[in-house]
């Protein structure tokens, strides 16, 4: 009997070690599916590699629009900062040329580092689409770099470590809410001390993550982690204790412009989540039947991920929902464009994305063990939100151009 127990124990240990070895190999060799469509050089001209250059080119494109339409407003909002005196949200507003019926709001950079791609899409929209659009009854508001600090310093969050897309609320109750699921995972999500990629915890991060998936399920974990939390100021996905300066600054602009229109349609541009090389249409769950039907009309022929399946999650304090709450008299249509980068809809892609976020946040708050760790971590995060692949960049612009061109025509038919 003793011999049998020893054999069984050896087998169990072998199975466990084999599983750890297999998942470690899978994790360490994971790469997202490559975009095979060749890059078009015409699409690449819209990309720049710094906040300052993106802002400069956004303004240049806006100035061209100013020559095409009447009463165009090109302006900026200075965002208060203890670190940098030159952080601005820039915007271009083209009013409906004859009768104000519908307004499009195309916003970018809510998650700072995602602003590179958002800026490129906005530049393309102005250069290739807006100049040829009929704006007799439709106005357009382009908001560039909603989180200029995160954009400039390659962070997803603001200077106060606030996730701007978890911060937006006109109800103080949000900032006092408790995400119990997040608290249960706090130690895993927010490790202390200098970050070292060679530590056992980081080298075998996927083992801990898979254990949590088995314990809670992927859907439950994803929701608990990503929906937002308001208890831990240095933690991931912190939504803040009050409205961030960026949101306070843009709110009166949104109210002032939107009040002239019966129908307001917001597209907020993001990168990161989902299949690499795919443009996902990703709103929060919608119960209003007319609103859902109108979105399906606007994006006819395109798949909409309604945020109510196992692969997706909902958030609290998001920017698109906030706009609707501050303009209650308007018929408001929200949508999020998410350009997938790391195949985060897969288990390994999701784990890699989370690990990237954890070590970047740990390094920012507690420093890095070595310069090599710092360089590798920051490079990985930038790649996750702004892929270096020219094929990926070109396809992102092409997909955006096709969908925006079609949806703008469909939007013209929407009535309150």
Where are each of the predicted segments found?
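Structured catalytic-domain cores with a bias toward divalent-metal coordination
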Residues: 2-416
């Amino acid at each position: 009997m003793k011999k049998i127990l020893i054999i069984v124990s050896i087998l169990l240990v072998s199975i466990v070690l084999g599983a750890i070895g297999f998942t470690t190999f899978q994790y360490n060799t994971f790469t997202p599916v490559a975009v095979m469509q060749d890059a078009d050089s015409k699409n690449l001209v819209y990309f720049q590699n710094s906040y300052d250059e993106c802002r400069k080119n956004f303004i240049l494109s806006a100035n061209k629009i100013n020559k095409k339409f009447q009463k165009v407003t090109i302006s900026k909002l200075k965002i208060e900062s203890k670190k940098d005196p030159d952080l601005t949200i820039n915007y271009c507003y083209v009013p409906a040329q004859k009768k104000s019926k519908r307004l499009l709001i195309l916003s970018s950079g809510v998650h700072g580092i995602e602003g590179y791609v958002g800026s490129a899409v906005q530049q393309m929209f102005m250069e290739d689409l807006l100049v040829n659009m009929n704006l007799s009854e439709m106005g357009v508001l382009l908001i560039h770099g909603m989180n200029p600090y995160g954009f400039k310093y390659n962070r997803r969050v603001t200077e106060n470590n606030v996730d701007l897309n978890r911060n937006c609320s006109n109800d103080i109750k949000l900032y006092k809410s408790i995400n119990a699921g997040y608290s249960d995972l706090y130690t895993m999500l927010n490790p202390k001390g200098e970050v070292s990629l060679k530590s056992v915890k980081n080298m075998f991060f996927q083992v801990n993550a898979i254990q949590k998936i088995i314990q809670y399920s992927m859907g439950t974990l994803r929701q608990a982690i990503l929906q937002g939390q308001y208890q831990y100021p240095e933690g991931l996905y912190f939504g803040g204790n009050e409205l961030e300066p960026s949101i306070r600054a843009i709110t009166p602009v949104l109210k002032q412009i939107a009040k002239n229109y019966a129908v307001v349609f917001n597209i907020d541009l993001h990168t990161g989540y989902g299949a690499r090389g795919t443009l996902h249409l990703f709103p929060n769950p919608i119960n209003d039947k007319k609103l859902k039907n109108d979105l399906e009309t606007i994006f006819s022929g395109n798949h909409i991920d309604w945020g109510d399946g196992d692969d997706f999650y909902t958030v609290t304090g998001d920017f698109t929902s906030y706009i609707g709450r501050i303009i209650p008299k308007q018929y408001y249509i929200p949508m999020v464009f998410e350009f997938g980068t790391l195949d985060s809809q897969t288990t390994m892609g999701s784990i890699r994305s989370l690990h990237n976020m954890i070590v970047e946040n740990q390094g920012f708050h507690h420093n890095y063990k070595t310069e090599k760790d710092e360089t590798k971590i920051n490079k990985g995060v930038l790649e996750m939100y702004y892929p270096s692949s020219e094929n990926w960049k070109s396809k992102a612009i092409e997909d955006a151009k096709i969908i925006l061109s079609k949806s703008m025509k469909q939007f013209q038919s929407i009535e309150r």
